Amino acid sequence: MLNEFKAFIARGNVMDLAVGVIIGGAFGGIVKSLVDDLIMPIVGAIFGGFDFSNYFLPLSSAVNAPTLAAARAQGAVFAYGSFLTVLINFLILAWIIFLMVKGVNYLRMQVERQEEAAPEELPPPPADVQLLTEIRDLLARRPAV
């Protein structure tokens, strides 16, 4: 059973998936920082200098705090600004993954086209067939009697 597990792990698809998950996790942090630290401040400046991550609607009359963190401590809130930030984060990540998959598919198609265009070399015939072919050719060149 251990050997079967080793064979399963050693297959390319499982290793590719593991690498993809690790890189995706790291890349997700990069995209989150891009959205939180670069894009959302620009969007906030365009719309009057507001920080979208602090936009919320109180769902209880007991909530009267000015920031999202304090409002959450007081009660239930509808944090639509935080959702907008996460949504933009997701859209950027999905777009980048789409472009990466599109690039990989393009490269894969190029390789397939090259393989189709290259003529396949036939393996040499067996030795007995080669010998019979040579005998036939010699007999064909021999003058008729």
From Swiss-Prot:
Record key words, sorted: Cell inner membrane, Cell membrane, Ion channel, Ion transport, Membrane, Transmembrane, Transmembrane helix, Transport
The domain of life for this entry's organism is Bacteria
* Stretches that traverse the bilayer: 14-34, 38-58, 81-101
* Chief location bin: membrane
Mode of membrane association: Multi-pass membrane protein
Function (record text): Channel that opens in response to stretch forces in the membrane lipid bilayer. May participate in the regulation of osmotic pressure changes within the cell.
* Quaternary assembly: Homopentamer.
* Protein name in the entry: Large-conductance mechanosensitive channel
